[in-house]
């Protein structure tokens, strides 16, 4: 943590002003989730992973979203059934820009929507028979599918359906994995529990009990896996390029553009490299305990973190990999200098004050990419973080930064109104609100239909997109209401 931001601004006073709008009980509860980072603090000073206040407009998702939308959904050669009423699956269909290689309906099924379409009678009498039929139809229509997952919606956990029994029976009948995921939306306080449940299902239903390689698999000393990169806009491909450039072999990449076979390859890796810590640390820890595979978190957002991560990864291998890492960093440095120099010229000497809205696991990695462009983060937070996420956040942000956990729509709008930033980086729910307020905005849950943002090439795209947002001439025509 270095220097401070928001100098001359009474940020604590702003927090108090925003909290004044709440009734006393809600004000006391929300006050625990809002803080201003202090020098030498042991953590960010906010409570996390606690239920949202009923009635507020929260930005969180549910356990179903965490399982299907994040962990399981991008696995491309499996079919993921939204088991329950049609709405949950329909409104989350293709909601994330997980890129794939393959032919839709043949070996790429992630862009398609499958649902058991629960009706009232299914809720009253149970849906196990219907689930049997759905799985049979899927196998008949898509014979090349390598596996099926059952993503439970809320009614499944309420009416006592035996999806585990159905899964075991159909797995034996079809000779393919049929995986039950108890990710009903009412479980937990956010999508974070859905991540955890999905990780546990991979542990119990997919990972082999033994580590002997399959026939034809040739192990090397440089085998690694990419975990928790969902290939938004091609991010995982950009990360893979760098890892292969330094001499490593990526034997599994999931779940973005991932396959069932890659999941099964996981225990053969020498090191597991995890990008989205919050959503995938559970399975990484399990493999360390079960198979003795070390893991490390890496960050390929922005050149500072890319160089640091490449060196940390290379340190786990021999001198050849270490030398290659330095060569790769040096190779891309001229491009980085050009991108940063151009960004500085375009900024016209102004500070880019970015309140980075809750981005879940993405919050922490993205911060330094803004710093690399010479921008200041004046406010940031998570929507589904745990305490350890905030502990890991401290060295990324500066003293005086506004920290908010599970920020409500009202709070975020008021903070933006009072702090008047140059750019808001947030999610789709907030995009049009702030654009109508006359503020530059980037939708950072799916890179605003751009990307990739990982890697050196991704940093150039990131810098271009931030420049286009901030320096768009339309903002000279529109005026913010404040």
From Swiss-Prot:
Keywords: ATP-binding, Iron, Iron-sulfur, Metal-binding, Molybdenum, Nitrogen fixation, Nucleotide-binding, Oxidoreductase. Its cofactor is [8Fe-7S] cluster; [7Fe-Mo-9S-C-homocitryl] cluster. GO terms for biological process: nitrogen fixation. GO terms for molecular function: ATP binding; iron-sulfur cluster binding; metal ion binding; nitrogenase activity. One of its GO terms (cellular component) is molybdenum-iron nitrogenase complex. [7Fe-Mo-9S-C-homocitryl] cluster binds at residue 445. Binds 1 [8Fe-7S] cluster per heterodimer. Binds 1 [7Fe-Mo-9S-C-homocitryl] cluster per subunit. It catalyses: N2 + 8 reduced [2Fe-2S]-[ferredoxin] + 16 ATP + 16 H2O = H2 + 8 oxidized [2Fe-2S]-[ferredoxin] + 2 NH4(+) + 16 ADP + 16 phosphate + 6 H(+). It is an enzyme of class 1 (oxidoreductase). Gene3D superfamilies: Nitrogenase molybdenum iron protein domain. [8Fe-7S] cluster binds at residues 62, 88, 154. The keyword Ribonucleoprotein does not apply. The keyword Calcium does not apply. It comes from the Bacteria. This molybdenum-iron protein is part of the nitrogenase complex that catalyzes the key enzymatic reactions in nitrogen fixation. PANTHER family: NITROGENASE MOLYBDENUM-IRON PROTEIN ALPHA CHAIN. Tetramer of two alpha and two beta chains. Forms complex with the iron protein (nitrogenase component 2). Belongs to the NifD/NifK/NifE/NifN family. This is Nitrogenase molybdenum-iron protein alpha chain. It comes from Azospirillum brasilense.
């Amino acid at each position: 943590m270095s220097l401070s931001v928001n100098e001359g601004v009474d940020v604590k006073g702003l927090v108090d002003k925003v909290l004044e709008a709440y009734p006393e009980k809600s004000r006391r509860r929300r006050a625990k989730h809002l803080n201003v980072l202090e020098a030498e603090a042991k953590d960010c000073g906010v409570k996390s992973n606690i239920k949202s206040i009923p009635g507020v407009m929260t930005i969180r998702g549910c356990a179903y979203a965490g399982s299907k939308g994040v962990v399981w959904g991008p696995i491309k050669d499996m079919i993921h059934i939204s088991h329950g009423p049609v709405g949950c699956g329909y409104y989350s269909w293709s909601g994330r820009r997980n890129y794939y290689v393959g032919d839709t309906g043949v070996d790429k099924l992630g862009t398609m929507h499958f649902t058991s379409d629960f009706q009232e009678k299914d809720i009253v009498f149970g849906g196990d028979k219907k689930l049997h039929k759905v799985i049979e139809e899927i196998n008949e229509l898509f014979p090349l599918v390598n596996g099926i997952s059952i993503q439970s919606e809320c009614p499944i956990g309420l009416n006592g359906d035996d999806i585990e029994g159905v899964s075991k029976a159909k797995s034996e009948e079809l000779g393919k994995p049929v995986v039950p995921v108890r990710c009903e939306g009412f479980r937990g306080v956010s999508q974070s529990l859905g991540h955890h449940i999905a990780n546990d299902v991979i542990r119990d239903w997919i990972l082999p009990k033994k580590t002997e390689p399959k026939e034809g698999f040739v192990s090397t000393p440089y085998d690694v896996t990419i975990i928790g990169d969902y290939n938004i806009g091609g991010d995982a491909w950009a990360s893979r390029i760098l890892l292969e450039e330094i001499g490593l072999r990526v034997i599994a990449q999931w779940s973005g553009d991932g396959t069932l076979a890659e999941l099964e390859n996981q225990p053969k890796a020498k090191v597991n490299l995890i990008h989205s810590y919050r959503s995938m640390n559970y399975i990484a820890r399990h493999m360390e305990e079960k198979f003795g595979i070390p893991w490390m978190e890496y960050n390929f957002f922005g050149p500072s973190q890319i160089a640091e991560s490449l060196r940390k990864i290379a340190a786990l291998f021999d001198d050849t990999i270490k030398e290659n890492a330095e060569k790769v960093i040096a190779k891309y440095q001229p491009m980085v200098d050009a991108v940063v120099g151009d960004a500085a010229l375009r900024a016209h000497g102004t500070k880019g004050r970015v309140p980075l809205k809750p981005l879940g696991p993405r919050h922490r990695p993205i911060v330094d990419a803004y710093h690399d462009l010479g921008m200041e983060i004046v406010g940031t937070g998570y929507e589904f973080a745990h305490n350890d996420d905030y502990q890991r956040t401290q060295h990324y942000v500066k003293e005086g930064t506004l920290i908010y956990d599970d920020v409500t729509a009202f709070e975020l709008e008021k903070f933006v109104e009072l702090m008047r930033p140059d750019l808001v980086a947030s999610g789709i729910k907030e995009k049009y609100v702030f654009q109508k307020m006359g503020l530059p905005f980037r939708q950072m849950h799916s890179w605003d239909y751009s990307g990739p943002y990982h890697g050196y090439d991704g940093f150039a795209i990131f810098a271009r997109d931030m420049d286009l947002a901030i320096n768009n001439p339309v903002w000279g025509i529109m005026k913010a209401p404040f």
